[in-house]
Regions:
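Short, glycine-biased loop/turn motifs at secondary-structure junctions and
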Residues: 1-141
Length: 141
């Protein structure tokens, strides 16, 4: 699976998705397609890019190394700095290096609090659904 950030490079220009693109008719259609196919997690990948920019013939590119903005095209750097990619999902790795040490500590507090809440409801949620036969795997009916 492709990672955040992916782009297609054609004629030395990066084509990528941002919040503005997702608000267009084509962007809304892309989101609907991904939701309908239970693949919203693919939003940051080349498949979504190729669907949105179907006319492009350029080369697939991606980078997950956020240690320096120099690893990315300047257009993408500007989009990140201007908070224009907040609706594009991260892959498995959240780029905490975007935050300074104080921001990372705050992020970890938020994450731990959310994880604690999730752990409280995880098992009861499973059994609540399992109780209903329509949600059970056929092998467990």
């Amino acid at each position: 699976m492709c990672q955040f950030i992916s782009w297609v490079e054609e004629d030395n220009k990066p084509y990528y998705l941002d919040n503005k693109a997702l608000k267009t008719k084509e962007g809304k259609s892309l989101l609907k397609y991904l939701r309908d196919n239970d693949s919203l997690c693919d939003l940051q990948g080349h498949g979504a890019l190729r669907r949105y920019y179907s006319e492009l013939k350029g080369r697939n590119q991606e980078c997950t190394d956020f240690s320096t903005p120099e690893n990315f095209p300047k257009e993408i750097v500007n989009s990140i700095k201007n908070m224009e990619m907040t609706n594009i999902l991260f892959g498995d790795e959240t780029p905490l290096v975007l935050l300074n040490s104080e921001g990372q500590a705050e992020y970890q507090k938020i994450k731990q609090s959310a994880l604690a809440e999730y752990k409280k409801i995880k098992q009861p949620a499973l059994w609540k659904l399992f109780k209903q036969e329509k949600y059970r795997n056929k092998l467990w009916i």
